[in-house]
Structure formats: C-alpha cells, structure tokens
C-alpha cells in the first residue's frame, strides 16, 4: 500500500499521467488531500470513477492518523495527542497556541511533530531519549500528524501557522523522510506552509546541518547544545562523540552564512549541572559575535533526577549572556503539566 500523502506534486502528476489521465487530475487529488481531509480515495468526488478504482486496485491509499488519547493543558493553549499511524505505531504530537495579547504580534498555532518513535541520541535529561530508538517515521506519517491537527483546528476557523520538528526523535537521523515531508508541506500545491514558518531541531549532527544548508530552503534551524564544552556535553548527550562543540557551532554559523537564517542554540538549564556563572561565561565566549540566538529552557520534569534551576539563577545566566552581546531569551513555557513540553514526549502513557 502506498499513501498518497507521500507524493510530491510533481510525483503525483507523473502518477496520473502514467495511468493515462491528464495532468490536471493530480491537482484534483492534491487539493482535497490538504484542504478537505478525505479518509478514503473514494471520498475525492472530483475524480472519475475509473481513476478512483484504478488507484485503489493499484494499492494506493490515504493514510490518516487515528487519535487514541487527547490531553489538554489547564489554560487550553496546549493539546497533546497520541496518534496511531498507518504502520500501527503510536506517536505523540503537540499543538501549542499563542495568544497575541501575551506574546504580541499575531495569534500562532504551532505543531510540534515527531520524526521517529523513540530516539537513539540518549540524552540523559530527555524522556524520549530514555525510551531508546524504535523506528523511523515515513514522510507520510510526519505529514499525517500535521493534517490531523489542521482538521481539528479548522473546525474553529483556525489554521496551523508554524511547524517545529521538535517532537520525538532526531530529525537529522531520519533525514530523507524528514526533508521529503518538509518539501511536501511547503509546496504551494501541497500543504502550502511558508518555509520560514518551519524550524528543524537537531542535537547537532554536523553532516545533517551541512546537508540542510545545501537544500536551498529558508527553514529555521535550532541546535540543542546544552553545554559549552565537550566534557560536559558528553555526559548529557552520550552519543555526542564525533562532532565537537566547536564543530557544531561552526556548522550552525555556516548554515547562517549559506541561508541568511539566524540559528538558535537551545540550552536546557539544569540545576547544579550546566547553570553556573562560569559555564555562562564559557558559553558567552563561544557564541559572542557569530549572530546566533540562545534559547534558555529551564529543564522540564521527566523521570530523571535533573532539577530546574531557581528563577534567579536562570535570569543570572541570561544576564551574563546578554551583557556579553549574545542574543538570548527564556522560552515561553507550554504544556509542562501535561508532559507535552520540551524533552517530555514518550508513548507509554499520556497523562
């Protein structure tokens, strides 16, 4: 069975032409896929019955995620879903909605998608990392997470405005499927989301960052750094062996030079581990003057022993970076109480 959500628009054109139908039939498939959310090929009423029958007989299908659990934060701004995918795997996906009265600008509806079940990176402070790696998700499974939430919020006359690859898994370790999903989701004949509204997060796989820089895309890049030196980073990210902190930062800077997109370095602050003044100064020295941005994330509760620093310690860390000329913010917290925040996703339970 081949999911129609897997096809790039040009591939959909080739499919219908190879089946003996005119090119425009591709758009008659693509438009309802991304705006009407059909569950079966037979639901696409614009298509001739002969094409519908041939697609079904040839093993094509429309794969839609099935929601098995839902939990919503107390303020109603964050929704976490456990979705059953067409490969019978379950994955967590999160919707975060931002009120402009709180953040300024326009309202935002951001989807946090997963690219893997579990993760092989083994970050000691991350619930997903402690699951271990199970499997990569196909592009259509990534897309189905987006489609499922779009269908939900469209009922409220809202639409997805932003997409972050910050859910379960390391996107760069599933590069081909991840980038296929990105290209489909940003194609005007696909989901049509603007490239600048997408951010890909990585633990710092240099080869993946370099490859992404060559894609000629305006995708945002977030690098999970968490430490200013290799000794500490190795303790927090056991798989961080081949690429040094300096090499990762250089790869991020090269991405900025290639794409013009400012790189964000994510830094999870852990009490007594990586939050001292000395470490803040070391980080400032590394990042000063390279045009990057640091997003400080007070560690979210997981099953591990790591604790969140005091607010005064967090603000002191930020002050040191800012006074050194490093652009820095503290992440707006979303979904912590429903285990939907950074580092909290896993599939064994949902609230």
Task: Indicate residue ranges for each PLM-predicted region.
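Conserved AdoMet/S-adenosylmethionine-binding subsite of the radical SAM
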Residues: 150-329
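Canonical Radical SAM [4Fe-4S] cluster-binding loop centered on the CxxxCxxC motif
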Residues: 97-144
């Amino acid at each position: 069975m081949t999911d129609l959500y897997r096809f790039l628009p040009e591939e959909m054109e080739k499919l219908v032409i190879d089946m003996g139908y005119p090119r425009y039939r591709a758009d008659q498939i693509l438009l309802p896929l991304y705006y009407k959310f059909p569950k079966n090929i037979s639901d696409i009423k614009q298509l001739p019955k002969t094409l519908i029958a041939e697609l079904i007989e040839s093993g094509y299908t429309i794969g839609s995620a099935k929601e098995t659990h839902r939990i919503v934060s107390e303020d109603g701004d964050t929704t976490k879903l456990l979705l059953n995918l067409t490969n019978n795997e379950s994955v967590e996906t999160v919707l975060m909605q931002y009120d402009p009265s709180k953040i300024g600008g326009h309202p935002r509806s951001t989807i946090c998608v997963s690219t893997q079940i579990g993760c092989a990176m083994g970050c000691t402070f991350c619930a997903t990392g402690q699951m271990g790696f199970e499997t990569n998700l196909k592009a259509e499974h990534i897309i189905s997470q987006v489609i499922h939430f779009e269908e939900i919020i469209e009922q409220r006359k809202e639409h997805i405005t932003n997409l972050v690859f910050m859910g379960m898994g390391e996107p760069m370790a599933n590069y081909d499927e991840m980038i296929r999903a990105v290209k489909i989701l940003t194609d005007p004949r696909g989901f049509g989301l603007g490239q600048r509204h997408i951010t890909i997060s990585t633990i710092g796989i240099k080869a993946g960052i370099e490859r992404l820089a060559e894609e000629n895309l305006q995708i945002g890049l977030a690098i999970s750094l968490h430490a200013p030196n290799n000794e500490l980073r190795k303790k927090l990210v056991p798989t961080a062996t081949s690429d040094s902190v300096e090499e990762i930062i250089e790869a991020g800077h090269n991405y900025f030079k290639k794409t013009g997109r400012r790189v964000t370095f994510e830094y999870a602050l852990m009490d007594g581990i990586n939050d001292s003044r000395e470490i803040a100064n070391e980080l400032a020295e590394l990042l000063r003057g390279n045009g990057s941005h640091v997003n400080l994330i007070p560690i979210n509760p997981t099953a591990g022993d790591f604790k969140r620093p005091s607010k005064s310690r967090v603000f002191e860390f930020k002050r040191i970076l800012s006074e050194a000329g490093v652009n820095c913010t503290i992440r707006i917290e979303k979904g912590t109480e429903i285990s939907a925040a950074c580092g909290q996703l896993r599939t064994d339970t949902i609230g």
